[in-house]
Amino acid sequence: MDKKLLMMALLITTGLATHAQEKLTRYQVRNAITVRTPIMNDSINPKGEKHTAKALLQTPVVLDLANAPTQMTAADTAGLVTFAKADKDNLLYLIKTQLRAERFMKGKLKVTSPVRWELFMNGESKMVKDASEDSISKAATKEVALRLEPEMDYEIAIKLLSTPDDKTVPSLKCELVKDDKFKEVACSTDPEQKHRFSLDNT
């Protein structure tokens, strides 16, 4: 009997943990943007510093994809989306999705990638990773705090930078982790979901 109770408790705990953490699986992706490193006399900035891959991540990109060439991309079973690696020129990918919680919710978005990236929420920069690793297995994971109001749309945009010097292909995994108190709050993560407008939008 004790063993049965223990097994049931483990199953319930596992179910709650699974419900509290989910992988994002669909993204809207803008076609890669070529970013060339300055050469010759332009190879240093006004401060006399050499241009670096970290600086390339600061290249301005229009986050609105309404008129941009895009495609829908699905993650694999591990939750990873993978893109073509830069060959001669650096490449910037813009990856977008949307979050909407049914009720007020707090949690975090865990982002894992072996290349450099910057994350925006509703157009505001929230996190920058300016170093690269040798493989996805060694990739650093960073967490972005979330505070979602009921039925509000939150646009997540990630700039992913691939350089010829990177040791691996650019890939990305995002996981939504709800705080314990909000495990049962439903939250959609669909890049194609229709926006909901409030009085502030009119």
PLM regions and their residue ranges:
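Beta-strand-rich ligand-recognition modules
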Residues: 121-171
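Short beta-strands within extracellular/lumenal beta-sheet-rich domains
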Residues: 87-99, 141-142
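Extracellular beta-rich ligand/substrate-recognition surface
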Residues: 83-92, 130-137
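Accessory carbohydrate-binding/adhesion or oligomerization-edge regions at the termini
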Residues: 21-78, 98, 155-202
